[in-house]
A protein has these predicted regions:
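Alpha-helical substrate-recognition element adjacent to the catalytic core
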Residues: 2-123
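C-terminal cap/substrate-recognition subdomain and adjoining C-terminal extension
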Residues: 79-93, 100-231
């Protein structure tokens, strides 16, 4: 039986972590009249996530059904379902926290038979033929992103829970400063190393399950010690 108030919550980034690609970029590349123009501006730090999404959405004319059909073919890490099962078996909450699009994330997860995960992301709204976005997790403390991931971390910690964070990119940087245990790869692993933030590398979610099990046995352990990213 699932614990209604788990002692440990796992927060996992989506784009580049659960999927090898970025869902928003996939949608923009295939369905937006402007393509990746605003995404490239975001990558250069010229605009924030809210402007990137809002301006790009204004050029999308495809239907919800067309986009959903394309998203259904997106691959996920084949070991992610193992993390879902591990969390549920151990009474932990597992949630997705992403600076991406909630509807797109939910569509991909459902296509792989994964249901019921909380998703903290920018909220896609379909209004007839019009596609818009709301930003319920925006906070001025992280102005360049639509989802303030530290805000989500603090939400769980305020309930007395320990938070495990898994990520790979720029929008994850502030969150790792507040998590109890961090798993990082790619750009996020480099950031953690440069900033002296303890973090364990990972190649797949089975490795993460094993390391979390060790940590639960003794949370005082520093799993990142002597474990460079990818080992």
């Amino acid at each position: 039986m699932t614990n209604p108030s788990p002692r440990v919550t796992i927060l996992c980034d989506f784009d580049g972590t659960i999927t090898p690609s970025d869902l928003a970029d996939f949608i923009f590349r295939n369905f937006a009249g402007c393509g990746l123009f605003y995404s490239q501006q975001w990558a250069q730090g010229l605009i924030d996530t809210r402007e990137e999404i809002t301006r790009t959405f204004a050029t999308i004319t495809a239907s919800r059904e067309e986009i959903a059909a394309a998203l259904a073919g997106i691959a996920i890490d084949p070991t992610f379902p193992d993390l879902v099962a591990f969390a549920r078996q151990n009474g932990m909450e597992l949630a997705v926290v992403s600076d991406g699009l909630d509807w797109a994330i939910d569509t991909v997860l459902k296509a792989h038979g994964i249901l019921g995960l909380p998703i903290y992301a920018n909220h896609v709204v379909f209004e007839g033929e019009k596609l818009t976005c709301e930003f319920p997790w925006y906070d001025s403390s992280t102005p360049l992103v639509g989802v303030c991931k530290p805000l989500v971390v603090r939400r769980y910690r305020a309930e007395g829970q320990r938070v495990i964070f898994i990520g790979d990119g720029r929008s994850d940087r502030e969150a790792v400063l507040e998590a109890d245990l961090v798993f990082a790869r790619d750009a996020l692993a480099k950031f953690c190393q440069e900033q002296g933030i303890p973090a364990s590398g990972f190649r797949n979610f089975n490795e993460i399950c094993s390391q979390i099990a060790r940590w639960l046995d003794d949370p005082r352990k520093n799993l990142a010690a002597g474990e460079p990213p990818g080992l």
